[in-house]
């Protein structure tokens, strides 16, 4: 039935994240984290003109590492993420049907795995230019898929995504003015059912221009 909070309500297992940050020296911040989500997409199914109660569950784990260094007038930050089914956080991801019980219609699921890495650098105080570069790669699924139509999530027909952001801000007491240009290229294709990876891709590029004016109280 599409996006719904019922999947995690039916699961009765809360979404969990455990992380730790470290400050090994002045200006440095490093950290690690692990995430778990467990969903029950359905509790019953209509199959061969009958209604069956089913016990379906999709559980996925994600892991991340990040670091940041803040100098006197510059900042560098980076993060890498091995994500599974984190589409509810606006990342590419989701899951697909990996098996169907021929007797009851009960389905098994497999999450898509995506690797995402980004770096960001900004320099200056009053005038502060910055650059952001991000890359996401679809690593497929752990099990084969039943059908390319039985996948659920966001951007599951994208093999890789490359994003660059060039930005500059002008900072005053209580005021901030900014400008950003952000091209993003996504490689769309068809899903290989055996691996969950995307093949026969073609690139589409989107260009975004953003202006900002902010007043701080």
Question: Where are the model-predicted features located?
Answer:
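A glycine-biased, small/acidic residue-tolerant capping/turn segment at secondary-structure junctions
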Residues: 142-145, 178-179, 187-201
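Surface-exposed coil loops of outer-membrane beta-barrel proteins
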Residues: 1-22, 90-107
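Detector for outer-membrane/organellar transmembrane beta-barrel domains
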Residues: 26-158
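A subset of solvent-exposed loop/turn segments in beta-rich extracellular surface proteins, enriched
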Residues: 12-14, 22, 34, 38, ...
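Alpha-helix capping and helix-loop boundary segments enriched in small/acidic/polar residues
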Residues: 7-8, 55, 201
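Outer-membrane beta-barrel "beta-signal"
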Residues: 172, 203-217
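Hydrophobic, lipid-facing positions within transmembrane beta-strands of outer-membrane proteins
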Residues: 14-18, 61-65, 115-119, 162-166, ...
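C-terminal closing repeat unit and adjoining cap/tail of repeat-based domains
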Residues: 167-189
